[in-house]
């Protein structure tokens, strides 16, 4: 099964009333080990390199976000500053000049959306939540 259509759906969910999208990249990884569900070949894929996926998955699986707090979150080769965590399922991060990340887990996956610099992270939060909650509703 290809999960790439979920990237398109997430990005579409971030559009505001004027039709402007507020997420430019996204991906889905497994919560067990951080293996990618979406392909890096998608035009809007957020590409996780090396240990980035496993490091993110380890924090969500254990619900221990201390590594994010002390060292930031690295995704697509960029280190983002941890902003906050909510309910052990949602993490927000930002890097000046690079945009922001929204990460939300379901039972078996972590959905990650990127808001470009100048984009509204709140809209990206909404898009990520739609996909994560849909997966959760399927027991995933």
UniProtKB/Swiss-Prot annotation:
It is found in: Cytoplasm, Cytoskeleton. SMART domains: PROF. One of its GO terms (cellular component) is cell cortex. Pfam families: Profilin. The keyword Acetylation applies. One of its GO terms (molecular function) is actin monomer binding. Keywords: Acetylation, Actin-binding, Cytoplasm, Cytoskeleton. It comes from the Eukaryota. The keyword Thylakoid does not apply. The modification N-acetylserine is found at residue 2. GO terms for biological process: regulation of cellular component organization. Occurs in many kinds of cells as a complex with monomeric actin in a 1:1 ratio. Belongs to the profilin family. Binds to actin and affects the structure of the cytoskeleton. At high concentrations, profilin prevents the polymerization of actin, whereas it enhances it at low concentrations. By binding to PIP2, it inhibits the formation of IP3 and DG. This is Profilin. It comes from Heliocidaris crassispina (Sea urchin).
């Amino acid at each position: 099964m290809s999960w790439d259509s979920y990237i398109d759906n997430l990005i579409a969910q971030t559009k505001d009333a004027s039709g402007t999208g507020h997420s430019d990249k996204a991906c889905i990884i497994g919560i067990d080990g951080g293996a990618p569900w979406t392909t890096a070949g998608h035009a809007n894929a957020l590409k996780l390199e090396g240990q980035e996926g496993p490091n993110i998955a380890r924090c969500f699986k254990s619900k221990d976000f201390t590594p994010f707090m002390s060292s930031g979150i690295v995704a697509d080769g960029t280190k983002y500053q941890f902003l906050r965590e909510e309910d052990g399922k949602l993490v927000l991060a930002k890097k000046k000049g690079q945009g922001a990340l929204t990460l939300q887990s379901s039972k078996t996956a972590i959905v990650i959306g990127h808001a470009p610099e100048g984009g509204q992270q709140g809209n990206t939060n909404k898009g990520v939540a739609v996909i994560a909650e849909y997966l959760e509703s399927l027991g995933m």
